[in-house]
C-alpha cells in the first residue's frame, strides 16, 4: 500500500525526523492561506500522486504550464497560482505511463537551502530476509540509473534482527555519505528513527530522495516515499486511514476486496490462473507466441465459485482485452469449482470474445464435463503450450 509524500513526511515527523513545514490543499482557493501560514521566502509547490518523476513530468493540459509537478514560488500568491494550475490536471511521468494521473492534492512547503543532496532507502532484502539500508551520494537522481552506471557509488547493508539497529549502522551510513561533525550525530539519530518507523509500521520500502544537508549544515528529509506491507495493514488503523483509493487502479481495487492478486498490464489477452508461478509462466508463454498479457491474476488455492466469477468480471472490464486464457492446475483448487465459476461468469457478463480453458489436476474430468455440457463456445486446451497457441491464434487470427 502506497501513500502520498505529505502523509509519509507527517508519519516520519512523528518519529522525530526533520522535515519542512508544509500544508496540503485540495482546493485552489485554500492555497494562498496555506502558503501564508509558512515563513517563506521560498515555497515549494508539489503535485501529490502515487508516482515518481514528478519534477520532470509534464501536464497534458496546456493551461497547467510547461513546468513539471514540482515548482518553486517566491510569494504566497505565486504558490497559490501554481497550485491552481496543477489541481485537477493530469500529470504524466515515466512511472505513470502515457495516461498519467490526475492531481487532486497539492502539498505546499517551506523551501530549503540545499548544500548537498543524497539518497537513502530502507527496504526488505528478500535475499537475506532482513531490513537493509541503501544509500548513495548521488541524491536527487533515479537510483536505478546510478546502479547501472556507477554501482560503486551505492552502499547497501542489512541489519541483523538479533541486534536491531545500532549506532554503528548510522555511522556507516554517515561516513559513506561523506558527513562530518554534528552531521554524523544527526545521521546516527535519524537512521534510528527511520529504522524504528520502518519496523513498527510494517513498511516494505522507505525512500528519501533526496536527503539533504541544508545551507545551515543540518540533515533534512526533503522528499519521502513510503509503501507498506498490504498483508499487515490490518494491524495499523492509522496506516489504513491513509489509503487513497482514487490513486489505485479500479480493477486492482476491486480484486483486493475479493482477495484476488491482480495487476493490470498493457496487453490484449486476459489471464486467470491459480498460483503466482504458473501465472508468470502463463504470461511468458503468451509473449513467446507473439501476444501480450493484459494482466496478472492469481485466484489462489481457495477460490470459490463467486470469487472466480468476480475475477472474470474484472478481466472483462478491461477494454483492451480481446481474449481470455484460463489456466488452472488444480491441487488445492478443484477444477470443477473453476469450471462452475467460468460458466457462471460467461453467462453473467455475456462474453463476446474467445475463451480458452486449460484444466488439469483435482476433479479435472468433472470440470471438463461441466464445460462441455454448458453449451458455451469455449475452446478446450490440453496443456499450457496448446492453450497459449490457441488463445493467440483466436485473438490474432
UniProtKB/Swiss-Prot annotation:
<keyword id="KW-0460">Magnesium</keyword>
<dbReference type="InterPro" id="IPR017866">
    <property type="entry name" value="Succ-CoA_synthase_bsu_CS"/>
</dbReference>
<dbReference type="GO" id="GO:0042709">
    <property type="term" value="C:succinate-CoA ligase complex"/>
</dbReference>
<keyword id="KW-0479">Metal-binding</keyword>
<dbReference type="GO" id="GO:0000287">
    <property type="term" value="F:magnesium ion binding"/>
</dbReference>
<dbReference type="InterPro" id="IPR016102">
    <property type="entry name" value="Succinyl-CoA_synth-like"/>
</dbReference>
<feature type="binding site">
    <location>
        <position position="223"/>
    </location>
    <ligand>
        <name>Mg(2+)</name>
    </ligand>
</feature>
<dbReference type="GO" id="GO:0006104">
    <property type="term" value="P:succinyl-CoA metabolic process"/>
</dbReference>
<keyword id="KW-0067">ATP-binding</keyword>
<feature type="binding site">
    <location>
        <position position="112"/>
    </location>
    <ligand>
        <name>ATP</name>
    </ligand>
</feature>
<feature type="binding site">
    <location>
        <position position="46"/>
    </location>
    <ligand>
        <name>ATP</name>
    </ligand>
</feature>
<feature type="binding site">
    <location>
        <begin position="331"/>
        <end position="333"/>
    </location>
    <ligand>
        <name>substrate</name>
    </ligand>
</feature>
<dbReference type="InterPro" id="IPR013815">
    <property type="entry name" value="ATP_grasp_subdomain_1"/>
</dbReference>
<comment type="subunit">
    <text>Heterotetramer of two alpha and two beta subunits.</text>
</comment>
<feature type="binding site">
    <location>
        <position position="109"/>
    </location>
    <ligand>
        <name>ATP</name>
    </ligand>
</feature>
<dbReference type="GO" id="GO:0005829">
    <property type="term" value="C:cytosol"/>
</dbReference>
<dbReference type="GO" id="GO:0005524">
    <property type="term" value="F:ATP binding"/>
</dbReference>
<dbReference type="InterPro" id="IPR005811">
    <property type="entry name" value="SUCC_ACL_C"/>
</dbReference>
<feature type="binding site">
    <location>
        <begin position="53"/>
        <end position="55"/>
    </location>
    <ligand>
        <name>ATP</name>
    </ligand>
</feature>
<feature type="binding site">
    <location>
        <position position="274"/>
    </location>
    <ligand>
        <name>substrate</name>
    </ligand>
</feature>
<comment type="pathway">
    <text>Carbohydrate metabolism; tricarboxylic acid cycle; succinate from succinyl-CoA (ligase route): step 1/1.</text>
</comment>
<feature type="binding site">
    <location>
        <position position="117"/>
    </location>
    <ligand>
        <name>ATP</name>
    </ligand>
</feature>
<dbReference type="GO" id="GO:0006099">
    <property type="term" value="P:tricarboxylic acid cycle"/>
</dbReference>
<feature type="domain" description="ATP-grasp">
    <location>
        <begin position="9"/>
        <end position="254"/>
    </location>
</feature>
<keyword id="KW-0547">Nucleotide-binding</keyword>
<keyword id="KW-0816">Tricarboxylic acid cycle</keyword>
<keyword id="KW-0436">Ligase</keyword>
<feature type="binding site">
    <location>
        <position position="209"/>
    </location>
    <ligand>
        <name>Mg(2+)</name>
    </ligand>
</feature>
<dbReference type="InterPro" id="IPR013650">
    <property type="entry name" value="ATP-grasp_succ-CoA_synth-type"/>
</dbReference>
<comment type="similarity">
    <text>Belongs to the succinate/malate CoA ligase beta subunit family.</text>
</comment>
<dbReference type="Pfam" id="PF08442">
    <property type="entry name" value="ATP-grasp_2"/>
</dbReference>
<comment type="function">
    <text>Succinyl-CoA synthetase functions in the citric acid cycle (TCA), coupling the hydrolysis of succinyl-CoA to the synthesis of either ATP or GTP and thus represents the only step of substrate-level phosphorylation in the TCA. The beta subunit provides nucleotide specificity of the enzyme and binds the substrate succinate, while the binding sites for coenzyme A and phosphate are found in the alpha subunit.</text>
</comment>
<dbReference type="InterPro" id="IPR011761">
    <property type="entry name" value="ATP-grasp"/>
</dbReference>
<dbReference type="InterPro" id="IPR005809">
    <property type="entry name" value="Succ_CoA_ligase-like_bsu"/>
</dbReference>
<dbReference type="GO" id="GO:0004776">
    <property type="term" value="F:succinate-CoA ligase (GDP-forming) activity"/>
</dbReference>
<protein>
    <recommendedName>
        <fullName>Succinate--CoA ligase [ADP-forming] subunit beta</fullName>
        <ecNumber>6.2.1.5</ecNumber>
    </recommendedName>
</protein>
<dbReference type="GO" id="GO:0004775">
    <property type="term" value="F:succinate-CoA ligase (ADP-forming) activity"/>
</dbReference>
<dbReference type="Pfam" id="PF00549">
    <property type="entry name" value="Ligase_CoA"/>
</dbReference>
Amino acid at each position: 500500500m502506497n501513500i502520498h509524500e505529505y502523509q509519509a513526511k507527517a508519519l516520519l515527523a512523528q518519529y522525530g525526523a526533520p522535515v519542512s513545514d508544509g500544508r496540503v490543499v485540495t482546493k485552489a482557493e485554500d492555497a494562498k492561506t496555506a502558503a501564508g501560514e509558512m515563513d517563506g521566502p521560498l515555497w515549494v509547490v508539489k503535485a501529490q500522486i502515487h508516482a515518481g518523476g514528478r519534477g520532470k513530468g509534464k501536464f497534458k493540459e496546456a493551461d497547467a504550464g510547461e513546468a513539471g509537478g514540482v515548482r518553486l514560488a517566491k510569494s504566497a500568491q505565486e504558490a497559490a497560482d501554481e497550485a491552481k494550475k496543477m489541481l485537477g490536471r493530469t500529470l504524466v511521468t515515466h512511472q505513470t505511463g502515457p495516461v498519467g494521473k490526475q492531481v487532486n492534492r497539492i502539498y505546499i512547503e517551506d523551501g530549503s537551502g540545499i548544500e548537498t543532496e543524497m539518497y537513502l532507502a530502507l527496504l526488505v532484502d528478500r535475499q537475506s530476509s532482513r531490513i537493509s539500508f541503501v544509500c548513495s551520494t548521488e541524491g536527487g537522481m533515479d537510483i536505478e540509473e546510478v546502479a547501472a552506471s556507477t554501482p560503486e557509488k551505492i552502499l547497501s547493508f542489512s541489519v541483523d534482527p538479533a541486534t536491531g539497529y545500532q549506532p554503528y549502522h548510522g555511522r556507516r551510513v554517515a561516513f559513506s555519505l561523506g558527513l562530518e561533525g554534528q552531521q554524523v550525530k544527526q545521521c546516527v539519530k535519524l537512521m534510528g528513527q527511520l529504522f524504528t518507523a520502518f519496523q513498527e509500521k510494517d513498511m516494505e520500502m522507505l525512500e528519501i530522495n533526496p536527503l539533504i544537508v541544508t545551507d545551515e549544515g543540518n540533515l533534512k528529509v526533503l522528499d519521502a516515499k513510503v509503501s507498506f506491507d498490504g498483508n499487515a495493514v490490518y494491524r495499523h488503523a492509522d496506516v489504513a486511514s491513509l489509503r487513497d483509493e482514487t490513486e489505485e487502479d479500479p480493477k486492482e481495487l476491486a480484486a483486493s476486496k475479493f482477495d484476488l492478486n491482480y495487476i493490470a498490464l498493457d496487453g490484449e489477452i486476459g489471464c486467470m490462473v491459480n498460483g503466482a508461478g504458473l501465472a508468470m509462466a502463463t504470461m511468458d508463454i503468451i509473449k513467446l507466441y507473439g501476444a501480450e498479457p493484459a494482466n496478472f491474476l492469481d485466484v489462489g488455492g481457495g477460490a470459490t465459485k463467486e470469487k472466480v466469477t468476480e475475477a472474470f468480471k474484472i478481466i472483462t472490464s478491461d477494454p483492451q482485452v480481446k481474449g481470455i486464457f484460463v489456466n488452472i492446475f488444480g491441487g488445492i483448487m478443484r477444477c470443477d469449482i473453476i469450471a462452475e465459476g467460468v460458466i457462471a461468469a460467461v453467462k453473467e457478463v455475456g462474453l463476446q470474445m474467445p475463451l480458452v480453458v486449460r484444466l488439469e489436476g483435482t476433479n479435472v474430468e468433472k470440470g471438463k464435463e461441466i464445460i462441455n455440457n454448458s453449451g458455451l463456445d469455449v475452446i478446450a486446451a490440453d496443456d499450457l503450450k496448446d492453450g497459449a497457441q490457441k488463445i493467440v491464434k483466436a485473438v490474432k487470427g
